[in-house]
Amino acid sequence: MSKRDYYEVLGVGRDASEREIKKAYKRLAMKFHPDRNPGDKAAEASFKEVKEAYEILTDANKKAAYDQFGHAGVDPNRGGGGGYGGAGDFGDIFGDVFGDIFGGGRRGGGQRQAARGSDLRYNLELSLEEAVKGLTKELRIPTLASCDVCDGSGAKKGTSATTCTTCHGQGQVQMRQGFFTVQQPCPTCHGRGKIIKDPCAKCHGDGRVEKTKTLSVKIPAGVDTGDRIRLAGEGEAGEFGAPAGDLYVQVSVREHAIFVRDGNNLYCEVPISFSKAALGGEIEVPTLDGKVSLKIPAETQTGRMFRLRGKGVKSVRSHAVGDLLCKVVMETPVNLNERQKELLREFEATLTGESKKHSPKAEGFFDGVKKFFQDLNS
């Protein structure tokens, strides 16, 4: 009997995407799966047909051969084509799509792979100076390391683990529950796939031991709160020789007494005297590289921002350097003696009648207030 067209089997068009093909396969495989149709030979045949169509149409090379030559292009008994090897066992492809729903994973597959080591996270707090300039930090990391007595095998020196005879190295066993077959960790080997008859005395068969290791970690200049540094292979050791996990260093930067950071720019407030603001002059302002001089123009108002280019932070991701922005805040003099108070009174008296000239903002404000109340009463 001639085979049906694979696209027809799945109920999709020839221009169907891989996602549409997979969706159709899921629906039909669920419908015809033998675990849902026990003893139904027709359903079993339909499942094999659906599975075969899915295998061909989701393999780029086989699909191309099928689209060009039809079934002949994927017939292993013919000279050309993609060498398709038949429908095989139910579980091979079904497990890829449904996982453990029916316990149909790779029944004919290899032994369970040892698990990769867990990733670790280390929270590192830096001062602003450390974050901006970069440094090398010595970190002490509590972790699980490969046992140095058994070299991570978990078995006593001179012995080795044997394949579990219950699960045959799979690490899982199948249990039937009604119409369904589910997979559970093997109760004999506890999901490992191997049995250690003579465990290592140091690690007690685990292959790993608790250890605190010291790492020298280079922190690049310009890091900021939220940045993360990945150290490949510095996490926990894997099970029985499997690859180690990674270590992630999570950076946070403490608040600074003077500077506030925003991206690559730094901000600070610089107090200046009343006379300096009025007459102008030079003041010293702090930077992360030391003090620098800043020229204050005469008649500078409080809150004015001055930009010192290139005095900010060098970006950790580029060569760009931010700026330092200094906000001047005029400080009202306190603890005045009588002579100083008298001088200020004399100065205030000289401003009488000339407020618009000397304090235009204040005069404008009070004019606005006066007009506001006049409008209320009108």
From Swiss-Prot:
One of its GO terms (biological process) is response to heat. It is found in: Cytoplasm. InterPro entries: DnaJ, DnaJ_C, DnaJ_domain, DnaJ_domain_CS, HSP40/DnaJ_pept-bd, HSP_DnaJ_Cys-rich_dom, HSP_DnaJ_Cys-rich_dom_sf, J_dom_sf. Transmembrane segments: none annotated. The keyword Phosphoprotein does not apply. Its cofactor is Zn(2+). GO terms for molecular function: ATP binding; heat shock protein binding; unfolded protein binding; zinc ion binding. Zn(2+) 1 binds at C147, C150, C200, C203. Participates actively in the response to hyperosmotic and heat shock by preventing the aggregation of stress-denatured proteins and by disaggregating proteins, also in an autonomous, DnaK-independent fashion. Unfolded proteins bind initially to DnaJ; upon interaction with the DnaJ-bound protein, DnaK hydrolyzes its bound ATP, resulting in the formation of a stable complex. GrpE releases ADP from DnaK; ATP binding to DnaK triggers the release of the substrate protein, thus completing the reaction cycle. This is Chaperone protein DnaJ. It comes from Shewanella oneidensis (strain ATCC 700550 / JCM 31522 / CIP 106686 / LMG 19005 / NCIMB 14063 / MR-1).
